[in-house]
Amino acid sequence: MDGFDRSNAPVEYQRVEWISDIFVFGMGVCWLINYAGMIYTSLQEQTYSMAPLALCCNFAWEMVYGLIYPSKSRIEQGVFLAGLVVNLGVMYTAIRFAPNEWAHAPLVMNNITLIFALGVLGSLTGHLALAAEIGPALGYSWGAVACQLLLSVGGFCQLLGRSSSRGASYTLWLSRFIGSGCVVGFAILRYMYWSEAFNWLNSPLVLWSLGVFIAVDSLYGICLWNVKKYEHGQERSNARKAQ
């Protein structure tokens, strides 16, 4: 049974499908807020918010499952296409301002556009290869898992590497965390009420990935709070010295 084709869903799942659709809609709203927030932050602070490799992988995933292997759910398909459109702005601002973060590495700074292009191309072909290997329905989910791990770990490493809240905010963190949490919500419903197609969600690798996502994104919030606390302390100290 193909998890993409809801017309074959069992009666048990059809009864709770509206709840799943609420989670899908919530995922879309949160990620659109996140994308819009990243564009705004990039323009204000002249930097990028999402780690480049994660951004390329995520953008390519939306291309593959928004255009090439579209979902049969109109809500899900609408969410993916809306995300892809807004993500174009995220890509543009990232490419425009990324050189500001790489002045210490001229080879990277002078080839940002090429690096992003290769990142998207590599991710796009990778997602297509995965879909060809295990099928679009499973490729959609495992590709999303890869994107989420890159987003979580990449964002956390970027925060630690910058030792600054530049390009970060509580809004960006919470919208990403809650948006991905909504994915967990509808995945649980599909596993519980459509086990024939989604029994694989109980696999050790999926559960490990879920644990990494929750742990790393929770640590991100804690570290962001500490970084902002330090920055506020520095601002107060500098203000006192200026008096």
From Swiss-Prot:
<comment type="similarity">
    <text>Belongs to the paxB family.</text>
</comment>
<feature type="transmembrane region" description="Helical">
    <location>
        <begin position="75"/>
        <end position="95"/>
    </location>
</feature>
<dbReference type="GO" id="GO:0016829">
    <property type="term" value="F:lyase activity"/>
</dbReference>
<dbReference type="GO" id="GO:0016020">
    <property type="term" value="C:membrane"/>
</dbReference>
<keyword id="KW-0812">Transmembrane</keyword>
<feature type="transmembrane region" description="Helical">
    <location>
        <begin position="169"/>
        <end position="189"/>
    </location>
</feature>
<dbReference type="Pfam" id="PF25129">
    <property type="entry name" value="Pyr4-TMTC"/>
</dbReference>
<keyword id="KW-1133">Transmembrane helix</keyword>
<feature type="transmembrane region" description="Helical">
    <location>
        <begin position="112"/>
        <end position="132"/>
    </location>
</feature>
<feature type="transmembrane region" description="Helical">
    <location>
        <begin position="19"/>
        <end position="39"/>
    </location>
</feature>
<protein>
    <recommendedName>
        <fullName>Terpene cyclase nodB</fullName>
        <ecNumber>4.2.3.-</ecNumber>
    </recommendedName>
</protein>
<comment type="pathway">
    <text>Secondary metabolite biosynthesis.</text>
</comment>
<comment type="function">
    <text>Terpene cyclase; part of the gene cluster that mediates the biosynthesis of the indole diterpenes nodulisporic acids (NA). Nodulisporic acid A (NAA) and its chemically modified derivatives are of particular significance because of their highly potent insecticidal activity against blood-feeding arthropods and lack of observable adverse effects on mammals, in particular the tremogenicity associated with the paspaline-derived IDTs is not observed.</text>
</comment>
<feature type="glycosylation site" description="N-linked (GlcNAc...) asparagine">
    <location>
        <position position="111"/>
    </location>
</feature>
<feature type="transmembrane region" description="Helical">
    <location>
        <begin position="205"/>
        <end position="225"/>
    </location>
</feature>
<keyword id="KW-0456">Lyase</keyword>
<keyword id="KW-0472">Membrane</keyword>
<dbReference type="InterPro" id="IPR039020">
    <property type="entry name" value="PaxB-like"/>
</dbReference>
<feature type="transmembrane region" description="Helical">
    <location>
        <begin position="134"/>
        <end position="154"/>
    </location>
</feature>
<feature type="transmembrane region" description="Helical">
    <location>
        <begin position="50"/>
        <end position="70"/>
    </location>
</feature>
<keyword id="KW-0325">Glycoprotein</keyword>
